Amino acid sequence: MNEPKFIHLHVHSDYSMIDGLSKPEDLVKKAASLNMPAIAITDYNNLYGVIKFYNMAHKLGLKPIIGITVNFFSDLINNQLTKLTLLASTQEGYKNLILLISRAYQKGYVHNNHVTIEKKWFSEINKGLILLSGGPQGELGKVLLNGQSSLISICLSFYQKYFPDSYYLELFRTNRDNEETYLHLAVDLSLSTGVPIVATNDVCFLSQEDFKIHKIRIAINEGEILQHSKIQNNYSNQQFLKTTEEMSDLFSDIPEALINSVEIAKRCNVFIHSGKYFLPQFRTGKISVEKYLIKEAYKGIKKRLNSRYLDIEKYKDIYSQYINRLDMELTVINKMGFPGYFLIVMEFIQWAKDNNIPVGPGRGSGAGSLVAYALNITEVDPLSFNLLFERFLNPERISMPDFDIDFCMEKRDQVIDHVSEIYGKNAVAQIITFGTLTAKAVIRDVGRVLGYPYGFINKLSKLVPLDPGITLKEAFSKESELFNLYKNNEDVKNLIDIAKKLEGTNRNIGKHAGGVVISPTKITDFCPLYCDEKGNNPVTQFDKNDIEYIGLVKFDFLGLRTLTIISYAVEMINTKLNLNKKRTININSIPLDDAKCFKLLKNSETTGVFQLESYGMKDLIKRLQPDCFEDMIALVALFRPGPLQSGMVDNFINRKHGRENISYPDHKWQHILLKPILESTYGIILYQEQVMEIAQVLSGYTLGSADILRRAMSKKNLKDMSEQRAIFEEGASNNGIDKKLSIKIFDLLEKFAGYGFNKSHSVAYALVSYQTLWLKSHYPAEFIAAAMTSDIDNTEKIVILINESLNMGVKIIPPNINLSKYEFYVNDQGDIVYGLGAIKGIGKNSVQVLIKEREENKFFHDLFDLCMRIDSQKITRRVLEKLIMSGSCDCFDKNRNYLLQSIDDAINASKESFRIKSFKQDSLFGIFQNELNQVKKNNLVNLVCPEKNKLQNEYQVLGFYLTGHPINQYKKELECYVNGVKLSQLKFIKRNKKILVAGIIVSIKIKITKNKNRIAILVLDDNTSRLEVVIFTELLNAYESLVKLNKLLFVHGMLNVSFIDKNIKMTAYALIDLSVLRKKYINKLIIILNKEKTNIFFLNNLYECLDKQSKGNIPVFIFFDNKEVCLNKKLNKKWFVVITDDFLNKLKFLVGSKNIELKFN
């Protein structure tokens, strides 16, 4: 091969977030297509893409050169920000790159969202590094351009001292400001000092045509439209991956700069090794880690079995099954070199349990390990459910075991902190993730940057289906309207063509949901770190796949909210049981055949139950009628798109209920050997483990090789499948199985393998579902209180759970400042006491201050007492308002309006009290106390708070009506107007039928359609249920005055069912105001009077009330009744009235609610 003339040494990928556009792999592919023997990656302030770059380079036969572009503030030139590119020439150099950039993040040196290093670090971190000066943007470049000749030698001497023969003056020719001036100064300096020069192109994109895309990408990052973007002026259209010939022409006058790029490339020899795993050492004393694992596993399994089988001699056959399985697993684990992994996981799980941190019973294929069960890593006995160890750890396919562990959401970080303390903070980090421009997002971002109207952009992005991970190409095939617009609309084509080029580009960084790395030494011995702006919360700069490539082991510490619910519910239950000296419950020891549980389940009463509360799942439960734990395991596996769309679910249900004959697996193609494997699923191949067992039984596969078969089937690799088919047929033939039968069964396996679910995971999560179901069945109040507490900030979920509690006969005690805690809890009477933390606008700190004072100094007597005892800076006026509006202060006075009016007096009194106390003026305080008592008396004037206002305030701070409902005052009227139809009854009414409904408007959303028309989406609430109503443009425009929050509205419309959530919705055809229906249906108003109500003062008030409402069409009847006379008098037409809410409220105030009657047609 001819000697290369140029190598690109300064190249940015899209991991630079702004400076680069192309994927590292695409850069390497482009370099390979240009016959370049090597290429560098020098992303801006990170090494995110190094592993992907390195792998692709090796795959295509290119030499990968690893580098980084960094910033630092130069003390030579007034702390100006300067750039520098570093390349690793040796393994030590690569480690130094890692060390430098990690230290920058750990120190928290951040400037305009970019991290900076310190120049002085080079005095200790310099070996194996080659420095490119940064061109005009580098420290030396700025010194040259500033004409500071006295600083040149000082600057050079630093780099020559620490980087002898490894510091190069970097030259650009990309048509940017000052480049050519700098270049001539740098060349002159090189000639006079002997410092070598090197040509680079500061590459940011693949081809010249990509410059426009690059500018759009920058504008997206800035949040600007294209013409307002400022940073893009720092780039030119020449910063593409030029060919060797193009670079040679560009620097034909400075050939040395080209030659040096090749010489540098030759010097860079870094290898990133893979194929070996690096685990932290688990301390076992003098005993080997293998023997320690065996000892702990045996100890654990004996403890498990002794608690279950009290007479071991009687159950010795069962005992031997467990020991044989345990020995097999231990042999595999030790042979594969993973005993330390199991022990590490065992330790932090046991620590969590010892410290009252809830841990899940298992997750994923790890629940199939008996060793894990023995070590208390899982709570699932794999032998009881026929789970396979080889699905988790396959001796015939070497890969790391991978336990996914669920912890209580609120305490998960405590476990990570514990691990950090055990293995060292510098050896533990979470794992980075990268957010990319998705199909919907890229359309919106590109459209905004190009200045297209919002409606145009919104229409296009909404045409992209909601499928997770969908690409624009896939969207075209699924949405014909999008494709047609692309073909026929030039603006759409322009936007989409640009969006396609940006789709999938890295946009931001995040943190893996649960991935944690534990390294045997410092993380930075293996991988660079990224930290937040304060230098905290370290995450690896490599994603989970790259972490695995370099041999670090990922542990998944996942947060599961359901465990928090279970823990809190059990805590409340056991506290009460302890007080009553009763036996407490252990949620991991509850029977799995509880009749009460399955009764609740079969009735689909699963709101709040883990995994089983969605509409679709409830529908499946109704159809399946599960009556055993195996059915619950199947539920988890069946409720997925594959089984639901394939007809497998219908077959399963029909077979369970005898509507279809059970066969193993198909009535045409079955074998008796398959019955024990498929019996629990009624002959349906539902689980991946069943695929493996069938291969073992029919064709003599080992379970390890059967797992390889399963993987090949799920990946649908034609070459692998062809090989596996031949092995399967031969094995079946050797077992005397008919060839045609074996081929047909293989075909069935191949079909179902795509739908097959991991049974180990299904069992573990079904167990969590069952635990929540059991708690709901036996302790509904505690369970619902715990569930509401876990969603204390989610008003919508709390409303659902309150309705569920009422359906189950559990009473809700409204918030009470003297009884409530921050969270929901169950009192001694078995009622749920509303949590103060669920009140909108009240922070946790405020609630804790209240509760602390209450616990230390007993109940608050009134609002003044509350304000006297707590500093107004801790409990502000706004917080007091929210407490009163929510009803939390009803224990002081039921009249919330009076309390609201008293806030200022109470606060002022408390401030004066605190002021006087601070001066210790006891005599003055005595005088002041008398004045305070007078203030209280003055405020005892009864300020009437209408029920409507009270409930509206309550809704504002709670998100729903708790102590009443504004619709209650219309109860009798609604029985006439809507024939008593309640929203909760709509599920029993035929679809596509027009009906009149009523409810209070609790939510209004106005949306703009593709044609720029408005539609309204309302939510009506009638205290029995809620209904979403869609009002289209014409109707909305005509009746918009009726569409107001907290207003009673009557809607005549068509019922339908949402395809998304299966909820009943309505399309409105007519909106009707209450006044219209009152005028149409009320035919008389009856006012009942007695002797006490006939004094002159009362009659004057009644006269005034009727007079203001006269000139209506509704007759008024006065019914007078006492022992002496009975009179029923219709007033003349002059007194006919208009019925309004205000009028009725005034009448009720005058004569009482019971003395008013409305009569209807």
UniProtKB/Swiss-Prot annotation:
The keyword Cytoplasm applies. It catalyses: DNA(n) + a 2'-deoxyribonucleoside 5'-triphosphate = DNA(n+1) + diphosphate. Keywords: Cytoplasm, DNA replication, DNA-directed DNA polymerase, Nucleotidyltransferase, Transferase. GO terms for biological process: DNA replication. One of its GO terms (cellular component) is cytoplasm. GO terms for molecular function: 3'-5' exonuclease activity; DNA-directed DNA polymerase activity; nucleic acid binding. Its EC number is 2.7.7.7. It comes from the Bacteria. Transmembrane segments: none annotated. It is found in: Cytoplasm. InterPro entries: DNA_pol3_alpha_NTPase_dom, DNA_pol3_alpha_thumb_dom, DNA_pol3_finger, DNA_pol_IIIA_C, DnaE2/DnaE/PolC, DNAPol_HHH, NA-bd_OB_tRNA, PHP_dom. Pfam families: DNA_pol3_alpha (PF07733), DNA_pol3_finger (PF17657), DNA_pol_IIIA_C (PF20914), HHH_6 (PF14579), PHP (PF02811), tRNA_anti-codon (PF01336). DNA polymerase III is a complex, multichain enzyme responsible for most of the replicative synthesis in bacteria. This DNA polymerase also exhibits 3' to 5' exonuclease activity. The alpha chain is the DNA polymerase. DNA polymerase III contains a core (composed of alpha, epsilon and theta chains) that associates with a tau subunit. This core dimerizes to form the PolIII' complex. PolIII' associates with the gamma complex (composed of gamma, delta, delta', psi and chi chains) and with the beta chain to form the complete DNA polymerase III complex. NCBIfam families: polc, PRK05673.1. PANTHER family: DNA POLYMERASE III SUBUNIT ALPHA. Belongs to the DNA polymerase type-C family. DnaE subfamily. This is DNA polymerase III subunit alpha. The gene is dnaE.
